[in-house]
């Protein structure tokens, strides 16, 4: 089942879903909403379930698009730079951590896929 709703205030029971997918969402959210989104994702996923996050990631210093993307983010994506400056776990509530975490980056580090297991 695919559910569309306010990601920072899910109307779902605790541990009620197998998986959560956050696809290019977090860079669109102010920090307080992003924190709520990740807290809610951790809350609603069953133990052993997965949270899959795909979003921007800070590319290496020699990446040919790094300078361009910095300008794009500053003008058009004001919350995206947070994802360059912090690991995603930094936005989780204090004391909340995934049981396991795996991160892969693509296109020279410009994009990331993070999979958390609860």
Residue ranges of each PLM-predicted region?
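Conserved Rossmann-like nucleotide-binding pocket used by diverse enzymes
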Residues: 3, 21, 52
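C-terminal alpha-helical "lid/dimerization" subdomain adjacent to the S-adenosyl-L-methionine
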Residues: 35, 52-113
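A short SAM/SAH-binding and catalytic strip from SAM-dependent methyltransferases
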Residues: 18-32
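A short acidic, Gly/Pro-enriched loop at the edge of an enzyme's catalytic core
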Residues: 8-20
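A short glycine-rich, Lys/Arg-flanked "PGG" loop and its adjoining helix->strand segment in the class I
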Residues: 35-47
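Active-site beta-strand termini and strand-to-loop segments that position acidic
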Residues: 116-118
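Class I SAM-dependent methyltransferase SAM/SAH-binding core
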Residues: 1-9
């Amino acid at each position: 089942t695919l559910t569309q709703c306010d990601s920072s205030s899910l109307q779902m029971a605790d541990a009620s879903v197998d998986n959560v997918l956050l696809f290019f969402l977090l860079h669109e959210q102010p920090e307080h909403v992003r924190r709520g989104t990740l807290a809610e994702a951790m809350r609603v996923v069953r133990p052993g379930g997965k949270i899959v996050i795909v979003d921007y990631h800070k590319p290496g210093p020699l990446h040919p698009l790094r300078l361009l993307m910095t300008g794009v983010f500053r003008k058009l994506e004001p919350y995206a730079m947070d994802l360059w400056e912090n690991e995603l776990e930094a936005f989780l509530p204090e004391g909340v951590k995934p049981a396991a975490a795996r991160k892969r980056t693509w296109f020279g580090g410009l994009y990331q896929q993070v999979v958390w297991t609860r």
